[in-house]
Structure formats: C-alpha cells, structure tokens
C-alpha cells in the first residue's frame, strides 16, 4: 500500500495496547507516519493543532466517545474532509448504522487482522482519490 506512506494517521483508543497494535499494523501495511491519542478529546485537540490525513478511532472511550469525536470532526470546516475509520469490540447493527449516518468512512470490529485493516484503509483511500 504505497499510496499511504506519506499520509499522517491518528489512532485513537483508550487502551494503550490497542493503540500500539493498530499503529504496528498500519506500519506493516506501509503507513509510517502514525500518532496516538488516548481519547476523543485529546484527538480533537491534536487534529486542530496539526495536519492529519486519516483517523482510526475506537468507539467506547471516556471523556469523548468515538461517535462524539466523529461528530466534532464532521462539524468542523477544517476537519470534515478527514476519513474516520471506526473500530469497536461490539458489532451492534445500530452502531454500524450510526457510524455510517454520522459520516464514518468505514467500520471494523475487534479483533481484526492486518488484511482487514489494509483492505478498509485501501478502499477508503481509493474512494477519496476518486472524488478528489
């Protein structure tokens, strides 16, 4: 996945182990510029203060959930273009529907494989390139 090597990713999860796993998987598929945030509030602060190209966010987090982060991103003129891939341990249909309705670029359920993450990231990036 060479197209994303220059992109800057933000991984948002309240569990540091999960952040490290996702970061490692992203690096394995060629995404070498990856930062981490422990919740939605920290992520939003980082997004407003820096240049990011892609967000991978857990849903269930303290302080600011992944859904609240997604809504804040989509409500911000400077950030709304960012693709957000939602990641969760729960595969509830209502969460999948809410993610899509709220503007998420995709949704995956933990645990997932490197191949699943690569497929989702690649599809999202191809979709963005086609609309650019």
Task: Go through the PLM ranges and name each one.
Residues 36-54:
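Acidic, metal-coordinating helix/loop segments flanking the phosphotransfer/catalytic sites
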Residues 61:
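Receiver (REC) domain active-site loop signature in two-component systems and cognate sites
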């Amino acid at each position: 996945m060479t197209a994303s090597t220059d992109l800057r990713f933000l991984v948002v999860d309240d569990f540091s182990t999960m952040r490290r796993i996702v970061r490692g998987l992203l690096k394995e598929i060629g995404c070498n510029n990856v930062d981490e945030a422990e919740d939605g509030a920290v992520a939003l602060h980082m997004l407003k203060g820096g240049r990011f190209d892609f967000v991978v966010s857990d849903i269930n987090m303290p302080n600011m959930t992944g859904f609240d982060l997604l809504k804040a991103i989509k409500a911000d003129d400077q950030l709304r273009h960012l693709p957000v891939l939602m990641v969760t341990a729960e595969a509830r249909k209502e969460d999948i529907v809410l993610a899509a309705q709220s503007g998420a670029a995709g949704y995956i359920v933990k645990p997932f494989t490197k191949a699943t993450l690569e497929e989702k990231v690649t599809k999202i990036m191809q979709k963005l390139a086609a609309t650019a």
